[in-house]
């Protein structure tokens, strides 16, 4: 195990990381133990009672966080003709078809999210190996393959995030910056948990949300008592 830095040790001094906390306490302590000299991101890890190797238990979706992510989201839109003009009007940072694909093949990936109209998906598929591993591949299930490019762009710019469980059944997502404060982080977390709850596969048996832990970029992870999920969503 790597040696923990002095700032980290000081931050967690006297803190019991084995406890399962309320949502409010976990968020507050995560923010309070932030120690980096930059505005850290607050992240959540949610362990789900699903087996992603079965397609009917794959949990993936998208949610627009009410308080955003505290960063500028660069959006590339794969489209042609009138849709290209519409995309630029809606705030797309890049819009086009063949020229964008050619740039990506040459190694260009200076954007944070991508949208595509259905008619150019065959073209976009040519750069699937570049986009897929970085989570940039447009997907109909998350609303990023659509002719309604204006709405998709506005959602992404407003703080929409796409998520899916990994092979271990764990879902990771950002919730904003430490500077947001507890109230906004909790608001974003509530929207995410509500969405994840709605996406519970009918084939999933037993406990659905099995574990939760929140942390900042450099900070420790604080466990959340999953027995409090219902109370949190009703609050």
Curated annotation (Swiss-Prot):
A biological process from GO: regulation of translation
Keywords: Repressor, Ribonucleoprotein, Ribosomal protein, RNA-binding, rRNA-binding, Translation regulation, tRNA-binding
The keyword Ribosomal protein is annotated on this UniProt entry: yes
Domain of life: Bacteria
Molecular function terms from GO: rRNA binding; structural constituent of ribosome; tRNA binding
InterPro entries referenced in this protein's UniProt entry, alphabetically: Ribosom_uL1_bac-type, Ribosomal_uL1, Ribosomal_uL1-like, Ribosomal_uL1/biogenesis, Ribosomal_uL1_3-a/b-sand, Ribosomal_uL1_CS
A Pfam family recorded for this sequence: Ribosomal_L1
GO cellular component terms listed in the entry, alphabetical order: large ribosomal subunit
Subunit structure: Part of the 50S ribosomal subunit.
HAMAP family membership: Ribosomal_uL1_B
General function of this protein: Binds directly to 23S rRNA. The L1 stalk is quite mobile in the ribosome, and is involved in E site tRNA release. Protein L1 is also a translational repressor protein, it controls the translation of the L11 operon by binding to its mRNA.
Family: Belongs to the universal ribosomal protein uL1 family.
Protein name: Large ribosomal subunit protein uL1
Organism: Lawsonia intracellularis (strain PHE/MN1-00)
Lineage per the UniProt record: Bacteria, Pseudomonadati, Thermodesulfobacteriota, Desulfovibrionia, Desulfovibrionales
């Amino acid at each position: 195990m790597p040696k923990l830095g002095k700032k980290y040790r000081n931050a967690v001094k006297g803190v019991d990381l084995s406890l399962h906390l309320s949502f409010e306490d976990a968020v507050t302590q995560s923010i309070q133990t932030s120690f980096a000299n930059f505005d850290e991101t607050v992240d959540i890890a949610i362990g789900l009672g699903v087996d992603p190797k079965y397609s009917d238990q794959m949990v993936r979706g998208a949610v627009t966080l009410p308080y955003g992510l505290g960063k500028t989201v660069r959006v590339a839109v794969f489209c042609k003709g009138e849709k290209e003009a519409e995309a630029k009007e809606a705030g797309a940072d890049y819009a086009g078809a063949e020229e964008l694909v050619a740039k990506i093949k040459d190694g260009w990936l200076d954007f944070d999210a991508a949208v595509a109209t259905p008619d150019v998906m065959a073209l976009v598929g040519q750069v699937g190996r570049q986009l897929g591993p970085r989570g940039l591949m447009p997907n109909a299930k998350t609303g990023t393959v659509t002719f309604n490019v204006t709405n998709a762009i506005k959602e992404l710019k407003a703080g929409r995030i796409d998520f899916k469980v990994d092979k271990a059944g764990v879902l990771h997502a950002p919730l904003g910056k430490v500077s947001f404060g507890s109230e906004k982080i909790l608001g974003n977390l509530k929207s995410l948990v509500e969405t994840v709850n709605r996406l519970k596969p009918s084939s999933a048996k037993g406990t659905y949300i099995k574990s939760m832990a929140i942390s900042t970029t450099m900070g420790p992870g604080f466990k959340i008592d999953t027995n409090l999920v219902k109370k949190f969503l009703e609050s």
